[in-house]
Amino acid sequence: MLWSIVRTRPLLRRRLYRLPFAADQRATLVNVKLKWVKDRALDSVVARERHLRQVHRLLELISTDPRGGVPIQELLIRPLHLGNLRVLPSDFLLRFPALFRRSSAISSGRSSPRIFLTDDAFQLRELELSVLRDSEPELVDRLRRLLMLAANFSLPLQTVDQLSWDMGLPSDYHKKILQCYPHFFGLVRPDDDERVWLKLSAWDPLLAVSELQRSSSAGGFNGNSLSFPVRFTRGFGLRRKCMLWLQEWQTLPYTSPYADPSDLDPRTDVSEKRIVGVFHELLHLTLGKKTERSNLSNLRKPLRLPYKFTKVFERHPGIFYLSQKLGVQTVVLREAYGGGRELLRKHPLVSIRERYAAMMNTGRPEICRRHLISEESEVVSSEVCYKN
């Protein structure tokens, strides 16, 4: 194998073996001209989750209230931010009659309106909690692998919070996971940083195998020049120069995202392949194999990436797709969808979230439904030259 694990104190750390390609790197990063082409299938994957996270947050709040329902007056002080709009939760929830219902209770001799879950929503929430309990060991391993990608096996807790929804972690994972697994996780505050960091307490070499290595090994290939699955949007025309470059780039040595990259020259295609590998692995750690680009913006130092590292998303449109839906850029791993709108391998939590999304569209006034599924203005495809 390219990488070996060696023991240090108090943890195990990674060390790069000096192979011929590592000693003879050249600044070979090629300027290529690529164009962004709209992928309607993957855009629909992003668009169908409009407002899902906000709805789920309020659903959790109501389901955990010991009174069974939350008084509307309490919701009035918690405005939601939906893009550029600030919406009162009570008004927002009543858009989804299949999930929420309004009822009045007598309190202190007067009527007090409250928001409750519908019976169907309550049953689905109970099923979700059951799946979360069953999936807990796997979710713990996902979080451990995320930290193993980072230098010193630690990330700012705020960064983990931003990724927690995409990774399927429960909203109270600080309590349900971090406190319940002290032998894996610890909170630290570095001397030169005011932020709280989440640190992995123990390195596990069994987890330090990337998804690409697993799939390649299952296919009978055990070399070090692993190729990424590539799939382009229908109608995407790859110029000959770009095609030749991509073919050569795929044959370059593959650097595990869990390995120490300090000996790699950031000006080389070998280093760029390592960056692609890091985000390929990170997206595989998410449930939907996607995340907002903004969630990755503060990962440069922890993941030991060069400046302008996110340009790999534009340079490799056959591996990643940048969706512009919902007013944000979302990075989607193409291979996970196989050219369609559905994940090839679907986690049970994804299926539950899809049922929530379907219930959000049930029983709504037609004008609201049309507004929910209306597409944003088309973004014109353009050719852009990405320079080193």
How would you name each of these model-derived features?
Residues 2-388:
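Long amphipathic alpha-helical repeat/alpha-solenoid cores
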